[in-house]
Amino acid sequence: GQAGSDLRIYTNQTTSNNNYPLRLDVTPELSFSQTFTDSTYAQKTIHEQHKMHEASNIKKANSASFEFTVPALTQNDLAVVKDLLVDYKTGTNTLNTFTLHIKLPNDTYRLDNCVITNGTFIIEKLENLKLGIQGQASRLVKGVSLPTFGRGTRSASRTHQRIDHLSVSIDSTPLTDGIYNVSIELQNDIEWNPYLTVNDALNVTNAATSMYPSNFTLKKRVLSGSIGQYVQSDFDTDTQQWKTGVPVVIKAGESDQQGFQFNLTNCTF
């Protein structure tokens, strides 16, 4: 799927965990899809040597995928997106799941049992702050109704976070001069639990009765990033060097108290 001009996207997960649908602000580059696993088998036999092509056998769906970008706002309306990326489900070592409702000009879609697998905090000079999201879901459904009850309230105004302040330090050494691009990326490495069974496979006749993934395991998490800096005459002597176990501090926003703030420890660069 590809987003159009009349885009509406809701998540049923709010900061208070009460499952009220909340409308998200996203850029037009929203995309989502789901494919099926095609297993093939040979048709060629002793008596039918001409059957060179293998036949298809579809029984299960792969996990669905989605991708969108949300702006960083001065208001706290969209903090839920960051929380779904970062926070563990209460009392567990796994992630919260949620539902996405997507309205396009001519149809509506729903992604069930969504989980965010990748989030990139985008910091670019002359651009507003943004958060890029990628994720997976168990099932993509077409032609469903948008949630109309109990919608989460949004602030009356939306103020995008400008980058009036950008500071970076690595191992207590400031790198502010010449910085033009910074990104911080959190990867949630998940694996969908096996869901192909003989009994269920016998009941598969079409897409509606296919087997879909339902549960996943969080295998590991990786936090990485990059810093773009123009080459200057007094460039730091750490160029083309590496260090481990050092702190990295990044602040980007309208001031050093607003926007994206990272105080990372035990980093390697």
Q: For the regions a protein language model found, what residue spans apply to each?
A:
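Signature of extracytoplasmic/envelope-associated structural regions
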Residues: 1-269
